[in-house]
Amino acid sequence: MTNVFVDSRRDLRERAFQALFSLEFGGDNLTAARFAYTYDKNEEEEAELPLFLLTLIQGVSDCRREIDKNISIHLKSGWTLSRLTLIDKSLLRLGLYEIKYHKETPERVALNEIIEIAKKYSDEKSSKFINGVLSQFVLERK
């Protein structure tokens, strides 16, 4: 039986963030996605992974160089991508990917979802920072 909340888009974004964070330490996309999706579920190892989850993880991986370039452009003078925490970097990558490349999700929805996940996994200062960087990117696209 599938729990609607557990497979909500927000939950899948959160699991994509967890997978992207773990990939900073090595591994492959599918293994990271499978672990992030099933680690707290009573599901078999062979549970079908939601397409949305796989799309986010693979999309960030495929576009990572361009995403990192866009993030770097929007950082304040003196800041570099390497100076960011892995949590903030992973959230920015996921948010920017969904805003720029995943056309099914309205920009403002993607922005709000990443900010809510940031509030859960980071501190208030970081969630405001992520909001500022991604909001600036959204405003420049208009």
UniProtKB/Swiss-Prot annotation:
Swiss-Prot/TrEMBL keywords: RNA-binding, Transcription, Transcription antitermination, Transcription regulation
Cited Gene3D superfamilies: NusB-like
Protein origin, superkingdom: Bacteria
Short name of any one Pfam family annotated for the protein: NusB
InterPro entries, alphabetized: NusB-like_sf (IPR035926), NusB_fam (IPR011605), NusB_RsmB_TIM44 (IPR006027)
Record-level Gene Ontology MF annotations: RNA binding
NCBIfam families linked: nusB, PRK00202.1-1
Function: Involved in transcription antitermination. Required for transcription of ribosomal RNA (rRNA) genes. Binds specifically to the boxA antiterminator sequence of the ribosomal RNA (rrn) operons.
Homology family: Belongs to the NusB family.
Record's protein name: Transcription antitermination protein NusB
Lineage: Bacteria, Bacillati, Bacillota, Bacilli, Lactobacillales
